């Protein structure tokens, strides 16, 4: 049924009938056909009759039957409430739909203003768009107000319709001049939305303001209005020109319901405790389908009461309402009957009754006796789907409308970007593409053939140019220097000034280069510094001894390089091991260590202070009969009363069979004969592994072996030293290896003690009176150490040297590979030079 047929039949009360219910061809039996036609006209449009419609081409039922469903709702009143809440959140207008309709309204407003530019008119929107209670398929209501209209209302409508067609913004335009409220109905070309344009109907704007106040007083009206509007729209009972109920009339019915039957729900929201929208919906359907007598009674929402139709007609001076019509008084204007066009309210009441029965049976199905397996199997998880399903056409249209709308201008019309909008998701804000219209416009110089693309600058090129500039400056400086050299001698002062200036510029350029390099490294996040290099275990004591005990005068006498305290620099031994790395890292290799024989052979002032390994110790010893013994040391008195702080702070590690010669640690008690390590040379007691308490006490034993040197001569050599190793004089005691080497050069063959006075048992000289002083006495004779064994056991002949080497419990003092046979015949240290032994003999030992 088209719009013309609907307008022609608007004078007679009739129900809106689906197209499929009317047969297209008449059978031979005309009475039966007329009877079926009359029955179909009397019956209201229900969900069953609407489902029988054949779907249009291009649409199918593949979309979900209840798109708002989030779960399987229970068959009870609480499940109905939860489903209504979910449907409200799904169907309510979002920001995209609101702004889209606002854009369409602005387009229509501009067109009407251009058409009536000679008159002062006012254009505004009202209805569901202003109250934000519109459905995805709702139309847009536009009001045109003007005080100096000339002619009949039909002329205004026709002129407005011609202007809309001329602007090419309407797909179709229809004029309804014979209606109670004359309107121009058009369909937008871009969005397919319907627009109703009315003239001088101020009541619509007032009604929109009234609905906004009602929503503030009864917030629960909003979800029920949207649900019932979709319910009526599904049955084609929402258009007034076909006898349906308008949106304003539906709001007044809900206001009357809340005022009389649910007044306690004022200012309550859907999430408040005690609110159940399912109960309110069932009560509303029951009231207006079974209890309200619309044929004899009218409704007055302003007075909160029911009024008989006869009284209403006589009271306001109007004729009585029609028996089948709805009498609904406007609270803003009591003389206005909002339901005067709702002549098909009987069909609306029947639809309310059917929905009430369906929902009532569904929510009470589990409470009934017996098992309704058929009903349970038919239930798909949604109750509202039984009374108001959404068609695939409506869902497809809504998704298309929110996905994106682009206006394509005609051939003659200029390019306009007023309606260009982009929507990505349902919650994304509106994006007006008019702000990006300049991207589509070609630049003025784009058509020229000699246009060149933009140059891409590489940062590397900038660095190259900077390097070239620096080279030019350097060349200029060199030329300036050459010119200064050619100047006469009389201008020496000027020449010096210019040289100073050039030097200053060189320094500035170097500073700039370093800053640029640092800036470049900072940009690339490159860290050029690293952690300190590890120090090998063989140079720990050596570096520590040299760095802590050496004085400034000693460092000046030696030719060793400067040492670093905490920067992690490599020691002399590591430099020798990593000679290849040193050659690669530095342009000019620096030799940090010399061979041992060169150090001993060279003068004392040129000796290396850092050479303090086991080789130094072997040099300080003298050899007798194949065994190495400590020389008559001048440090015995200094080590007579050592301190145990070093031992307590750094306990000795247990190493049963391996001795680290560079660190001076003893492996066992049998190795105590060689306790002259670097700690002794610093005036401290050497560490030991013996658990004996006598070894932990002070002033009970000597740190070194017993030396039978006359006490007087010993006092004469160390007259400035005290027993604790301190020096009372201003001159510091000599504790470094370099000084020991110096002393070696001054030793002569004429000594205080001769070889005849040497004790054959321990190799120490015997005093003249035959009395050994207490400081030189042997301690712990009963201990099984190698030193005590030498003092107590008889002298071993040279022939037994080979057998003594097989005793593994004795100390191997020849681990460095020196030939001791050359030292057995003489004890003169001044002419003693160590000789290296081949590796084969070294392995055998």
From Swiss-Prot:
Residues 643-653 have a biased composition (Basic residues). Germline-specific. Its cofactor is Mg(2+); Mn(2+). Mg(2+) binds at residues 139, 141. It is an enzyme of class 2 (transferase). Residues 26-49, 561-571, 579-588, 654-666, 695-732, 788-805, 819-828 have a biased composition (Polar residues). Its EC number is 2.7.7.19. It is found in: Cytoplasm; Cytoplasmic granule; Cytoplasm, Perinuclear region. Residues 482-506, 605-620 have a biased composition (Basic and acidic residues). Its main location: cytoplasm. The keyword Transferase applies. The gld-4 locus produces a single transcript that is SL-1 trans-spliced. Cytoplasmic poly(A) RNA polymerase that adds successive AMP monomers to the 3'-end of specific RNAs, forming a poly(A) tail. The enzymatic activity is enhanced by its interaction with gls-1. Required, together with gld-2, for early meiotic progression in male and female germ cells and for gld-1 protein accumulation in the hermaphrodite germline. In the germline, forms a complex with gls-1 which directly binds to gld-1 mRNA and prevents its degradation. In contrast to other poly(A) RNA polymerases, lacks any RNA-binding domain. This is Poly(A) RNA polymerase gld-4. It comes from Caenorhabditis elegans. The gene is gld-4.
């Amino acid at each position: 049924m088209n719009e013309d047929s609907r307008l022609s039949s608007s004078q007679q009360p009739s129900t809106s009938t689906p197209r499929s219910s009317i047969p297209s061809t008449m059978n031979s039996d005309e009475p039966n056909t007329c009877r079926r036609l009359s029955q179909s006209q009397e019956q209201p449009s229900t969900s069953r009759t609407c489902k029988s419609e054949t779907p249009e081409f291009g649409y199918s039922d593949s979309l979900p039957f209840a798109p708002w469903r989030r779960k399987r709702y229970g068959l009870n009143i609480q499940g109905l409430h939860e489903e209504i809440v979910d449907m409200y959140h799904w169907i309510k207008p979002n920001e995209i739909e609101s702004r889209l309709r606002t854009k369409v309204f602005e387009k229509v407003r501009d067109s009407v203003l251009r058409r009536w530019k000679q008159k002062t008119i006012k254009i505004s929107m009202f209805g569901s768009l202003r109250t934000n209670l519109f459905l995805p398929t709702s139309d847009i209501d536009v009001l045109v107000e003007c005080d100096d209209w000339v002619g009949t209302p039909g002329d205004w409508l026709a002129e407005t319709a011609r202007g809309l067609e001329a602007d090419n913004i309407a797909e179709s335009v229809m004029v309804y001049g014979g209606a109670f409220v004359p309107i121009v109905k058009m369909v937008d070309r871009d969005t397919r939305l319907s627009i109703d344009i009315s003239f001088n109907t101020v009541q619509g704007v007032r009604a929109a303001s009234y609905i906004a106040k009602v929503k503030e007083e009864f917030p629960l009206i909003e979800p029920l209005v949207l649900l019932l509007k979709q319910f009526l729209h599904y049955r084609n009972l929402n258009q007034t020109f076909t006898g349906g109920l308008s949106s304003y009339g539906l709001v007044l019915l809900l206001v009357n319901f809340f005022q009389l039957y649910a007044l306690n729900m004022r200012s309550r929201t859907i999430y408040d405790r005690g609110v159940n929208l399912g109960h309110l919906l069932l009560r509303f359907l029951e009231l207006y389908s079974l209890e309200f007598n619309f044929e004899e009674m009218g409704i007055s929402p302003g007075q909160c009461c029911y009024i008989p139709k006869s009284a209403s007609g006589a009271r306001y001076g109007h004729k009585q309402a029609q028996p089948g019509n709805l009498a609904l008084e406007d609270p803003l204007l009591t003389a206005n009957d909002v339901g005067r066009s709702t002549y098909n309210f009987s069909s609306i009441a029947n639809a309310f009754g059917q929905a009430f029965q369906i929902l009532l049976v569904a929510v009470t199905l589990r409470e009934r006796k017996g098992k309704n397996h058929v009903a349970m199997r038919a239930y798909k998880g949604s109750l509202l789907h039984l009374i108001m399903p959404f068609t695939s056409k409506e869902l497809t249209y809504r998704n298309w409308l929110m996905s994106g709308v682009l206006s394509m201008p005609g051939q003659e019309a200029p390019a306009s970007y007023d309606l260009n909008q982009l929507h990505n998701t349902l919650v994304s804000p509106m994006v007006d593409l008019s702000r990006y219209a300049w991207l589509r416009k070609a630049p003025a110089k784009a058509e020229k053939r000699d246009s060149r693309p933009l140059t891409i600058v590489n940062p590397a090129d900038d660095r190259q140019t900077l390097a070239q500039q620096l080279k030019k400056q350097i060349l200029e400086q060199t030329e300036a220097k050459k010119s200064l050299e050619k100047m006469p001698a009389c201008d020496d002062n000027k020449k010096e000034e210019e040289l100073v200036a050039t030097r200053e510029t060189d320094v500035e350029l170097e500073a700039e280069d370093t800053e640029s390099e640092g800036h470049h490294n900072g940009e690339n996040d490159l860290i050029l510094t690293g952690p300190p290099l590890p120090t090998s275990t063989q140079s720990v004591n050596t570096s520590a001894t040299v760095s802590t005990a050496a004085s400034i005068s000693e460092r000046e006498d030696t030719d060793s390089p400067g040492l670093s305290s905490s920067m992690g620099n490599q020691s002399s031994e590591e430099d020798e091991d990593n000679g290849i790395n040193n050659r690669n890292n530095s342009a000019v290799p620096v030799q940090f260590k010399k061979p041992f024989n060169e150090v001993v052979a060279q003068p004392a002032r040129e000796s290396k202070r850092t050479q303090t390994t086991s080789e130094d110790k072997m040099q300080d010893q003298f050899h007798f009969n194949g065994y190495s013994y400590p020389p008559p040391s001048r440090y015995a008195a200094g080590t007579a009363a050592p301190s145990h702080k070093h031992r307590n702070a750094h306990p000795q590690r247990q190493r049963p069979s391996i001795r680290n010669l560079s660190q001076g640690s003893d492996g066992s008690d049998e190795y105590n004969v060689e306790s002259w390590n670097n700690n002794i040379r610093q005036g401290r007691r050497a560490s030991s592994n013996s658990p004996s308490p006598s070894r932990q006490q002070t002033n009970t034993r000597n740190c070194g072996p017993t030396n039978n040197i006359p006490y007087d001569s010993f006092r004469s050599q160390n007259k400035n030293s005290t027993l604790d190793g301190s020096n009372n004089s201003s001159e510091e005691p000599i504790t470094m290896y370099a000084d020991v080497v110096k002393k070696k050069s001054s030793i002569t063959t004429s000594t205080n003690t001769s070889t005849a006075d040497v004790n054959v048992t321990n190799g120490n000289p015997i005093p003249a009176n035959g009395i050994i002083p207490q400081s030189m006495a042997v301690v712990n004779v009963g201990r099984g150490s190698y030193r005590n064994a030498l003092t107590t056991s008889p002298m071993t002949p040279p022939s037994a040297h080979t057998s003594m080497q097989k005793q593994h419990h004795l100390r191997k003092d020849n681990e460095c590979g020196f030939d001791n046979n050359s030292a057995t015949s003489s004890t003169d240290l001044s002419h003693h030079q160590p000789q290296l032994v081949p590796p084969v003999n070294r392995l055998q030992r």
